[in-house]
Amino acid sequence: ELTTAAQVSSLTGIQRGLEKESLRINNAGKLAQTPHPTELGAALTHPYITTDYSEALLEFITPVSTSISATLETLETIHRYTYAHIDDELLWGASMPCILEGDASIPVADYGTSNVGRAKSVYRMGLGHRYGRRMQTISGIHYNWSLPGLNNNEHFALIRNFRRHAFLLLT
C-alpha cells in the first residue's frame, strides 16, 4: 500500500515512451517493396517516424511523458498520419513477419549518403549477413520507462536486484 505522498509521487512521476515497429505490406499481404514514403519525413531525422532494419519496417516513437493517455494518444496520432500517407499499403499487425519471398526481397533501410546515414545502413547490412534478413523483420513494441530521481547506474542496480530476487517477486 502506498501511504506517503513521496511514494505516490514516485509512481506518478514515472516517465515512459513507446517504440512500435510495423511492417508495411501490399494488398497481397507481402512485404512492401517501395521505399520509405517521403510524406513520412526522413527516416534518419524524423523524431517520431523512422525505419528499423528494412525500408518496409516502420518504427513509431513517442516522446517521453508522465501521462499514459498522452503517450497512447500520440501513438494513435502517428498511426493515423502514417495510414493517411502510405497509399494502398497496410501495416502488418503481428510481430512475426508477413509473407516473405527470401532475403533478397527484404530491402535494407536506406538512410542517405551522410556519414551517419551510411553507418546506419552498413550496420543493418551486417546484421543481415550475421543473422539473416528474415530475422530482422520480426517486430515488436518497446516500452521504455524511468523512475524519477534515478540515474542510469541506479536503474541498472534496480534491474539487477529484480533479476536476483525474481523467483520471490514473481511467485
Task: Show which residues each predicted segment covers.
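Terminal catalytic/cofactor-binding subdomain
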Residues: 1-128, 137, 157, 167
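Internal, well-ordered domain-core segments that constitute the primary functional module
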Residues: 123-171
